[in-house]
């Protein structure tokens, strides 16, 4: 009898737990998975505006032949390969400097470095457009030192460089906070013991700091990769995809396909699904590599 009562009590607790959990599961399914399913169904249709008809996987076949999509894919991965490693390396260096217990005004430096990511996307894009304008601050400095001014937004490579600089400026401080939090969880006695044993700063960095920060580095790598693959604001507000479409990202192209050109929601949805698959595959690869190391 007592056993039955105990089992009933446990079952009640389990049911209560599942009842609370089910609310969150339903909300996640409704706000995340249901829109994904609808987007996939939409990607199987074609037509302009709301006049859509089912056409199978023709939108996906079109993606393989679309030169504009290939160009935006190249641009997006160019930003990813160049910007993410530089940004995360700078974030780790800054976090290591700010973790020094002898450094004065730590709070001030942390705030100053973190502040860019709290800036409005539109306002910071306008600031960078002004800085790199033909008569902007950067060209003024170049003239002052006797160098030739650069028409930053008239050339594809220099325009891409401006976007990369802007991304690094904005997001380095954000990732630095993660690294700083991880460093502060490492006992200072570990570093002291390493120094007593004669370890050099390079050995401390590669043998102690980076291995102990591996979960944090993996997290920032995945989030930064996902964010860059979905990059939109800088492409739109800084260069508007120009010159031509040489700096346009995949998300910017999806936006133009949906709302700027003749609206083709089916094709835009197909490109969105492709980005989703890329994000998922890269995240799985990064997690697999992180686990092996």
Regions found by a protein language model. Give the residues of each.
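A structural signal for multi-pass alpha-helical bundles of membrane permease subunits
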Residues: 4, 9-293
